[in-house]
Amino acid sequence: MTVEMKVERGLFDEVMVPCYNPMEMIPVKGQGSRIWDQNGNEYIDFAGGIAVSCLGHCHPVMVNALTEQAGKLWHLSNVMTNEPALRLAKKLTEVSFAERVFFANSGAEANEAALKLARRYAADVYGPEKSEIIAFKQGFHGRTFFTVTVGGQAAYSDGFGPKPGDVTHLPYNDIEALQAHISDRTCAVMMEPLQGEGGIIPPTAEFIQAVRELCDKHNALLVFDEVQTGNGRTGEFYAYQGLGVTPDILSTAKSLGGGFPIGAMLTTAKLAEHLKVGTHGSTYGGNPLACAVAEAVVTEVSKPETLQGVKEREQWFREGLAKLNEKYQIFAEIRGKGLLLGAALNEQWKGRARDVLVAAGKEGLLVLVAGANVVRFTPSLVITKQEIEEGFAKLDKAIASLV
């Protein structure tokens, strides 16, 4: 019998690279939208692992998919293909515009592949001078050196030496700035169809349409980073489907695996031809375990009743936040769509989003922040009404403790 080593939060500071600052409690069990720590304390989960746990913790369809595949085949590499990867790729083409799929292990890797494809396509078709990538301030696209540079937040990208070049950042939702800058040198515009880390900022209908039209005018590719917005999060399987425009390349991850690491880049057959054998790859991309779980997730999330349920739950959250605001006058506005929501703090509470997060944790509720002024909610897409009501009761107590 194996004797497990006793683990406490202090061990983190002894053995881990200090680029995270985790909570003091250590979760050991999860079920639905509840988790329990080492001491048996229960928490309602409104964070969902930062928009990852789309079916909650330990959902039966995911557990069954993982355990069944674990008894068959774990890994091959891409010297061979495998059945779960092919089935998942087929499903992703059925629920999106895409005709071709590249599998990776994370959102950052999916975005890296998207950017490399955009540059490769432009160089092949128009020449090496067509290399500019336009992205938006306060965007977030991952932590590789390329993707963190394209993300428009200097706090994440500064301090690592010379950055990859030919990347321009413009204000989000600013049509005039984009019109003034985009040119025939632009190979791609990369954007989140709803900015997540930047504060849950939705695009205006006019802006999203203008981006598509300007990309077409200048033969630039439109790349949508749907790492956070995808897989049912906004009430559509992918957010672009509710915006009236279609990207040329789309990245997806986070809730694609429901908690099992996987990412994917989706694109057209025409563009995919430019990543020939050997031009890109991933040892773990398309891993049978990851793809088996993701296939189960996509099947469950793409059901009409699941997507409709997201819209219903959005209303429950908005009603709960409105009641709290009526009581405490804390929020300036509620932003977002589906179950990617941000409660922007008003002037009186400015800069206190983390205070709310910490207070909520003490009451047994997990929430997120999106900058210093926005409390972010990205719960399971199938969270129950009872769990939501319990969570808001805890959030009420948390805010009361701060007044």
UniProtKB/Swiss-Prot annotation:
SUPFAM superfamilies the UniProt entry points to: PLP-dependent transferases
Coiled coil stretches, renumbered: none
The protein's required cofactor(s) are namely: pyridoxal 5'-phosphate
Record Gene3D superfamilies:
Aspartate Aminotransferase, domain 1, Type I PLP-dependent aspartate aminotransferase-like (Major domain)
Enzyme class comes to: transferase
* Gene Ontology CC annotations of this record: cytoplasm
Q: Where does N(2)-acetyl-L-ornithine bind?
A: R143, S282
**What Pfam family is a match for this entry?**
Aminotran_3
Pathway annotation: Amino-acid biosynthesis; L-arginine biosynthesis; N(2)-acetyl-L-ornithine from L-glutamate: step 4/4
Summarize where pyridoxal 5'-phosphate binds, as residue positions. G107, A108, F140, D225, E226, V227, Q228, T283
Keyword Cytoplasm found: yes
Q: Subunit info?
A: Homodimer.
Q: Which family does it belong to?
A: Belongs to the class-III pyridoxal-phosphate-dependent aminotransferase family. ArgD subfamily.
The record ties this protein, via HAMAP family, to: ArgD_aminotrans_3
Q: What is this protein called?
A: Acetylornithine aminotransferase
Organism in which the protein naturally occurs: Vibrio vulnificus (strain CMCP6)
- Lineage, broadest ranks: Bacteria, Pseudomonadati, Pseudomonadota, Gammaproteobacteria, Vibrionales
The gene from which this protein is expressed is argD
